[in-house]
């Protein structure tokens, strides 16, 4: 049976941990707001480029970009986005589970897999699963990621696609729905399919390209793919901070519950000890 001193020390220890979890909750809340701002700022840019690409894809260009052409799938590549730090609930585990299920589906079709990984958690995980799948990785991008940190990793996979070593490219990350909800999501990046509706087709008009449609399309498609990956990174960052904030709040609340239970136990121990001492005093006086 625990002594009164041990229970008191345990309560104090939990109190100290609770202070840390509350501090981490507040830090995560602040970082989440910053990540949300980044996410909202980058969205219009990505959507605007996508509209232009959809419009161009409906045009009658002599030049047909490799990113717009479908082909037989023999190898699939993924940009995998995870966090560098833990204490974020099941955020990374959910992404890994979804990706492993998708990889299993492709393996049944004898399709090879290549991964470009962002975040140390995914790097560690897939190094244990199969290091041969990893072709590129980056970690330590911080709380305010920059496009320049991702260019090399994005370019590696695009080069493999252009060389025919990868036939389809996907992006997997945690999509930020709201503070309480983040869901793992896989989206196809290449080949690019038009999202235009019938109205766009019937009311189609074409651009005049200067100096050349090939130069424009090459640049535009690369910028679009880079912005898609960046958007995934900032959404995953917002999801990470949100999940960490919720996890730390849950830890603080659980700590409070444990402290209440320990206080009840502590009071019972004290009551038992006082009762025992009184009984000893009474029995001692009766002997006298």
Swiss-Prot record:
Matches recorded under Pfam families: ATP-synt
Is Ion transport given among the entry's keywords?
yes
GO BP annotations of the record are:
proton motive force-driven plasma membrane ATP synthesis
Q: Which GO terms describe its molecular function?
A: ATP binding; proton-transporting ATP synthase activity, rotational mechanism
Q: Where in the cell is it found?
A: Cell inner membrane
UniProt superkingdom = Bacteria
Keywords for the protein's UniProt record, in alphabetical order? ATP synthesis, Cell inner membrane, Cell membrane, CF(1), Hydrogen ion transport, Ion transport, Membrane, Transport
**GO terms for CC?**
plasma membrane; proton-transporting ATP synthase complex
Q: Which Gene3D superfamilies match?
A: 3.40.1380.10, ATP synthase, gamma subunit, helix hairpin domain
Question: Quick one: where is this thing mainly located?
Answer: membrane
Membrane topology reported for the UniProt record = Peripheral membrane protein
Q: Which InterPro entries match?
A: ATP_synth_F1_ATPase_gsu, ATP_synth_F1_gsu
- What CDD domains does the record point to? F1-ATPase_gamma (cd12151)
Question: What family is this protein classified in?
Answer: Belongs to the ATPase gamma chain family.
Q: What does this protein do?
A: Produces ATP from ADP in the presence of a proton gradient across the membrane. The gamma chain is believed to be important in regulating ATPase activity and the flow of protons through the CF(0) complex.
Subunit structure, per the record? F-type ATPases have 2 components, CF(1) - the catalytic core - and CF(0) - the membrane proton channel. CF(1) has five subunits: alpha(3), beta(3), gamma(1), delta(1), epsilon(1). CF(0) has three main subunits: a, b and c.
User: By what name is this protein known?
Assistant: ATP synthase gamma chain
Origin organism lineage: Bacteria, Pseudomonadati, Pseudomonadota, Gammaproteobacteria, Enterobacterales
Q: Which gene encodes it?
A: atpG
């Amino acid at each position: 049976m625990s002594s009164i001193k041990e229970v008191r020390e345990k309560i104090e220890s939990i109190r100290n941990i609770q202070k840390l979890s509350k501090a981490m909750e507040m830090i995560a809340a602040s970082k989440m707001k910053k990540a949300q701002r980044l996410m909202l700022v980058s969205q219009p840019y990505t959507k605007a480029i996508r509209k232009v690409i959809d419009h161009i894809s409906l045009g009658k260009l002599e030049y047909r970009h490799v990113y717009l052409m479908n082909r037989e799938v023999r190898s699939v590549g993924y940009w995998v986005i995870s966090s560098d730090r833990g204490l974020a609930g099941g955020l990374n585990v959910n992404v890994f589970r979804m990706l492993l299920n998708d990889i299993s589906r492709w393996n049944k079709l004898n399709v090879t897999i290549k991964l470009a990984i962002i975040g140390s958690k995914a790097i560690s995980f897939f190094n244990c699963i199969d290091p041969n799948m990893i072709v590129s990785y980056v970690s330590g991008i911080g709380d305010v990621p920059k496009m320049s940190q991702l260019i090399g990793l994005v370019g590696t996979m695009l080069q493999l696609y252009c060389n025919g070593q990868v036939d389809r490219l996907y992006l997997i990350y945690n999509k930020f729905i709201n503070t309480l909800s983040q869901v793992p999501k896989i989206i196809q990046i290449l080949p690019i399919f038009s999202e235009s509706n019938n109205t766009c087709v019937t009311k189609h008009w074409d651009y005049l390209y200067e100096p050349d449609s090939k130069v424009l399309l090459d640049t535009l498609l690369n910028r679009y793919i880079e912005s898609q990956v960046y958007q995934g990174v900032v959404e995953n960052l917002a999801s990470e901070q949100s999940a960490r904030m919720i996890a730390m709040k849950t830890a603080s609340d659980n700590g409070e519950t444990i402290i209440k239970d320990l206080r009840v136990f502590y009071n019972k121990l004290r009551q038992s000890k006082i009762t025992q001492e009184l009984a000893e005093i009474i029995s001692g006086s009766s002997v006298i």
